[in-house]
From Swiss-Prot:
One MF term in the entry's GO annotations: four-way junction helicase activity
This protein's name: Holliday junction branch migration complex subunit RuvB
Residues engaged in binding DNA: R312, R317
Record has Hydrolase as a keyword: yes
Gene Ontology CC terms: cytoplasm; Holliday junction resolvase complex
Protein's cellular compartments: Cytoplasm
UniProt enzyme class: hydrolase
Originating organism: Paenarthrobacter aurescens (strain TC1)
Catalytically driven reaction(s): ATP + H2O = ADP + phosphate + H(+)
Region of interest (Small ATPAse domain (RuvB-S)), ranges: 184-254
Record function comment: The RuvA-RuvB-RuvC complex processes Holliday junction (HJ) DNA during genetic recombination and DNA repair, while the RuvA-RuvB complex plays an important role in the rescue of blocked DNA replication forks via replication fork reversal (RFR). RuvA specifically binds to HJ cruciform DNA, conferring on it an open structure. The RuvB hexamer acts as an ATP-dependent pump, pulling dsDNA into and through the RuvAB complex. RuvB forms 2 homohexamers on either side of HJ DNA bound by 1 or 2 RuvA tetramers; 4 subunits per hexamer contact DNA at a time.
Similarity remark: Belongs to the RuvB family.
Length: 358
């Protein structure tokens, strides 16, 4: 079973109170995502000028980039109450009807992981978003009747890490869609500077750069690493965090200079030392590192692929040339590079089921 990871983009339950204190409260304080911020500001300002609820908003992108924060900012900018729920919590149309029927005029409803809602609830949401009305079915079989229920105008903010799983009719009902992208190191430094100020931490520029460089382009991870470095500095009696102390702290937590953790390095190490760089099937690779295939596929692989360290081909997973270099191995002649992916033809769906060692 995978250990909790410092570099997971997901939010841990114990982090929620701290994260809430560090969240920006308005678009001006929100760092990064310049394109989405600019577009969203225009949508909200126009809505306020018209005196109407804002259009429904869909935020997509990997975990930890600010989708929940933006939902809270939308409610604050519109001076409206915020109702928070999630797709997994809405498994029946009745669950959604109960939420919708209790909304007040202008209220913002935030549905996290909206792609995980049940199909009956999705179909009810279509009418609610478009006509601000739902039909409540009373009775069963031939005697069932639909009672229309009028809803006050509201703004739905949906968040998803897998926009491709949303049905087209649902996507089309959002007036604004914003895709959040990973942050640059410079943007993460700004996030860390703001958080350090709120936490009353003394960190120099080199310290911010060191932490930002290991944060996988994700503000949530950056803030998490900052708190771990703070703990390390407190125990070691260090008043100002610099690059050396930040590096020592994160090395202790096994987060390396590129943001790889123990599981990431184990996957690459197994590919190189046990399978000569691959290709190897997912199930075999998971056995080699002592984890479940789903853990390797969903926790480790996305970042490794994005960093160009691991490739997925129809024949299985391969270690790219940069993976050999990163782990300190000499790159053998003819080892896999980007041209090899082109030769094999990347096929993620097939690669997920293939279990070939050679």
């Amino acid at each position: 079973m995978a250990e909790p990871s410092l570099v997971s983009g997901g939010e841990e339950p114990e982090e929620r109170v701290i994260e809430a204190a560090l969240r920006p409260k308005n678009l001006h304080d929100f760092v990064g995502q310049h394109r989405v911020r600019k577009q969203l500001a225009l949508v909200l300002e126009a809505s306020k000028m018209r005196g109407r609820s804002a259009d429904h908003v869909l935020m997509s992108g990997p975990p930890g980039l600010g989708k929940t924060t933006l939902a809270m900012i939308i409610a604050a900018e519109m001076n409206a109450p915020l109702r928070i729920s999630s797709g997994p919590a809405i498994q029946h149309a009745g669950d959604l009807a109960a939420i919708l029927s209790s909304l007040s005029e202008g209220e913002v409803l935030f549905l996290d992981e909206i792609h995980r809602m049940s199909r009956p609830a999705e179909e009810m949401l279509y009418m609610a978003m478009e006509d601000f009305r739902v039909d409540i079915v009373v009775g069963k079989g031939a005697g069932a009747t639909a009672i229309p229920l009028e809803l006050p105008p509201f703004t739905l903010v949906g968040a998803t890490t897998r926009a491709g799983l949303l049905p087209g009719p649902l996507r089309d009902r959002f007036g604004f869609t914003g895709h959040l992208e990973f942050y640059s190191v410079a943007e993460l430094e700004l996030v860390l500077r703001r958080s350090a100020g709120l936490l009353d931490l003394k960190v120099n520029s080199a310290g911010f750069t060191e932490i930002a460089g290991r944060s996988r382009g994700t503000p949530r991870i950056a803030n998490r690493l900052l708190r771990r470095v703070r703990d390390w500095a407190l125990v070691h009696g260090i008043e100002q965090i610099d690059a050396r102390s930040a590096s020592a702290a994160l090395d202790m937590y096994e987060v390396d200079e590129r943001g790889l953790d123990r599981l990431d390095r184990s996957v690459l190490e197994a590919l190189i030392t046990k399978f000569n760089g691959g290709p190897v099937g997912l199930s075999t690779l998971a056995i080699a590192v002592g984890e479940e295939p789903e853990t390797v596929e969903t926790v480790a692989e996305p970042f490794l692929v994005r960093e160009g360290l691991l490739g997925r081909t129809p024949r299985g997973r391969i270690a790219m040339a940069s993976a050999w270099t990163h782990l300190g191995y000499a790159v053998p002649a003819g080892v896999f590079g980007q041209e090899t992916l082109a030769l094999y033809g990347e096929d993620e769906n097939h690669a997920e089921s293939v279990d070939t060692v050679g």
